[in-house]
């Protein structure tokens, strides 16, 4: 059921009353003992202090055993005002009777407040936690054994009482009406923390300088009086906030550690699984090897037996032939010996002729019938040599990922759109293939993120050689290359190596060259030639008066390009870039479509849109480097001989640009298709040697663009 209107009003009134009483109590609390003022003194500074607290201040200022009578002054604990004492000491100060009357009325109002009669104001000033209230607290005043359970604890007396002892010791009259009664709490919670320097004082301040809990006397007359102090509440809030923040971080870290530990446990489990798998695979592979050895053993044994049978059969046939021949020869020998015993010449001649022919024939045929003995037939040239196989078996081991290859930068070559990468490896026999990865290098700062970004890398897989040529690259651009060696066990990467393509090569375009310029056969040199007037005029051709211009035969709309110009003895020239739409009948740099570095005798300037800026340049400048970074909207000029940066134009390119060259005297030679020198191979912007100043050669110059 809902609360009745009368109850709601009553509860609201009770809450308002409690709030007002708590506010009033804070005004009636002594700054030393933090209790309601008791026998308050009215100090000259208009603050008040308990008589007993003032007495403790004087006692704390004395050495042990000394009297407080010689003390003639002390400081107000609230405002630090020095209070002077007469010969009467503290008794010479006025009593704050009005404040005492207010305290008396406050205590009566606390007892007869709007809440239930069984719970007075002094009983509500301190509520123990549920953990404290659940403990069994024994009465500390009972004489019986065991003592009865306490029903209240007096904060002022610091003693817990049962109901009988409470009525006996705390009648409803002064000074007991000012005692604060709470639910029973243990003695350890009741005592609180006392000051280290003043044993009878509770801590109520925090010394920031010494990082220590102190009491009011420590700040007033103790060794902390000149230190920075803070209230316990402020320090409590700050420390609690810090602890909560650190606790949050610790909980987060514990969560991360738990996740990490879970991953480690998962890895351990995976190790167990993989180990079992590898052990099973090892047994399987070894069993297969043993099976192969057994099969080869049986096969070789069969071959030995077959060879033995074949050789013995052959030898047996030869033995039989020899035996047959021997038998015939023996018969013939016996017949011949018998004839030789015949003394009758006629009979001998009659029989010997036939025998002699047979012996001669047998002697001749025996040379044919006797077989040649081949000692190879004795199986002596047969040998079993498994030393190579034994060595392979001794080197039997599980396969590991190959050693990382190393890119040989000194062997790598480049053109304006290709780079050939060479690498070596000391582990080629265990490598099944290579993989080449590359991407555009945009600065050291983003290399780590670039390295971890899979989408930004181009990949060339399944390379079998130790070199590879990458085609279709941007001109004058730096790339990062990584080579990965791969086998069945895994892969390992080489260290990243930076390589760069050369700039786009170009030559001077005869169709755009001024009529009074002579172009060399290779298209790389231009020279002033007043006699060369045979060329016809076209809209593309430079046609300025007094200056003679030429342009390269390319239009650039991307990439980074570097070329150099050798000026030789020329003292009046302009070198830069221009849009195709730039006017051909005026000096380059005098319009918004061209940007140049120019020399006029001893003056060096950069010019754009009819504005110039002087540049500090060594007078011996004979070669000018030009770096066009179209993608980053920059055109820079350098002194390559001295590794000196001269000037950089910041340009927002909207159209393709063309290299342009103008001379007033002598000649120029172009060196194109060059790699950018290492001294300008850094991402940091270098300081230029420009200073704003009006030039006498072009009107309307105020600043460098």
UniProtKB/Swiss-Prot annotation:
Residues 486-679 form the B30.2/SPRY domain. Pathway: Protein modification; protein ubiquitination. Its main location: cytoplasm. A zinc finger (B box-type) spans 137-184, 190-232. Its EC number is 2.3.2.27. It catalyses: S-ubiquitinyl-[E2 ubiquitin-conjugating enzyme]-L-cysteine + [acceptor protein]-L-lysine = [E2 ubiquitin-conjugating enzyme]-L-cysteine + N(6)-ubiquitinyl-[acceptor protein]-L-lysine. Residues 340-399 form the COS domain. Zn(2+) binds at residues 195, 198, 218, 224. Phosphorylated on serine and threonine residues. It comes from the Eukaryota. One of its GO terms (molecular function) is zinc ion binding. The tripartite motif (RBCC; RING- and B box-type zinc fingers and coiled coil domains) mediates dimerization. Associates with microtubules in a manner that is dependent on the C-terminal B30.2 domain. E3 ubiquitin ligase that plays a role in microtubule stabilization. Mediates the 'Lys-48'-linked polyubiquitination of LRRK2 to drive its localization to microtubules and its proteasomal degradation in neurons. This ubiquitination inhibits LRRK2 kinase activation by RAB29. Homodimer or heterodimer with MID1. Interacts with IGBP1. Belongs to the TRIM/RBCC family. This is Probable E3 ubiquitin-protein ligase MID2. The gene is Mid2.
